[in-house]
Amino acid sequence: MKSFTKPALGAAVVLALAPLAAAAGDALTIYSSAQPGAIRPEQYRNGVSGPAVPGYAVVRHLRMLELKPGRNTVRFTDVAALIDPTTVSFESLTDPKGTSVVEQNFQFDLVSAQKLLEKYVDREIEVDQVRGSGVETFRGTLLSTSGGLVLRRADGGVQLLPHNAGVRLPELPGGLITRPTLVWDVAAARGGRHEARVSYQTGGITWWADYNLAYAEGTNANACKLDVGAWVSILNQSGAGYTDAKLKLVAGDVQRARPPGYAAGGLPAARMALEEKVAGFEQKAFFEYHLYTLGRPTTLPDRSTKQIELFPVARGVPCEKKLVYYGLAPGWRNVQPNPITDRNYGVQTNKKVDVYLSFQNAQANRLGMPLPAGRVRVSKRDDADGTLEFIGEDTIDHTPKDEKVLIKLGSAFDVVGERRQLAFSVDTSRRTMSEEIEVRLRNHKDEPVTVEVKENLYRWVNWKIVEQTHDYRKEDARTVVFPLRVPAGGEQVLRYTVRYTW
């Protein structure tokens, strides 16, 4: 039998077998996935395996059990299959000082057809094999189960049989269990009824936030409003279900040690009125993270996904729509350790103009609460029939209150860009180079648009724009942004010259 064992404190005789009684209460603290939106719907719908789920939880069980004075064996089968046995804790709340764990085992040698056969290697079995319209029975000693059944008959001959043959075993061998089981050797100073708490970490369970945004046009082409709703999505593939459990969620990047090579404030009055009817999540700061506690018990069946409302819909949140043109093709945006003097480096163009939405996570905007990392889906109402149509999605990281949320929706259909190099020169003796860039934006809409042209000055860290046709602002050490107004059905042209020195 496979087991995880803590060293015993001394030899003793087991006096009693004390199975744990029915649950008095379960509690889970689930830690947010480091990869919001990393699990696609088709993955968990088709049964993504528990070890592939990028999250974990701390599970706590309260159980009532009968102990005798002295040594007791306690078995606990209501345990997650993906438990980390090194994190298991057993504690008697009735007599914590007089009750101690001498030895702890995690048994996971689960019964299966293959395991049963392996237990009968070098033992005699009977195998029924269909032969035409009849059945032939073979008796012999099982030598191997690899690639089929290998039997040594009484006459010394060897019989090879397929795995799907009908095997008859005289009895169920010992040492096999139907569910993962924790077994404790408990020393109790006091006998009688004890309330015990069992806790452990398990994989195969995670949570993330799903935000549903309804977009509406504002007073101009860039202004807009959003209705922001948020739900918590919980995926449980841990190998255990949790009934009427107390639920807490932790948002934040909590550090965990991994083996090498491992892959894996107050509420507005309108909201309070709703929460009096159905208890929702209460949020508070917790260490350097945020803790969300559900005000009611909930049930999380194994191999299931559950959604719970994180907060009621915040309506009419002011937002801004931006068109951003990043003309440098994606493959050429990396920073290099030396000046890039190759004139053909980065001249490839990207024609797509990206569409972004941004809003401030502020109380004045009917938000102002920590937003956990998750997926953001945006829809817009079709005035013809009143239905909401999907217009894009993105993921966001953990976002504190009063910070800006930026969402990329996709690329504009009617606005295109083109970037090209007009001139380039290098003077290696003076350690200088000069490059002239032209950006053309074409607007096929019936209304003017504003496009932010983002230019990455990627050739070297020391740069100066010596000529330009439009004003710009510096976004960071190597990026500038030119806001351009493009007329309806027209074109706007930007030219600038940058000089690098090293």
Where are the model-predicted features located?
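Long, intrinsically disordered, low-complexity accessory segments associated with secretion
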Residues: 2-5, 15, 20-502
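GHKL/Bergerat-fold ATPase module in large chromosome/replication-associated machines
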Residues: 9-12
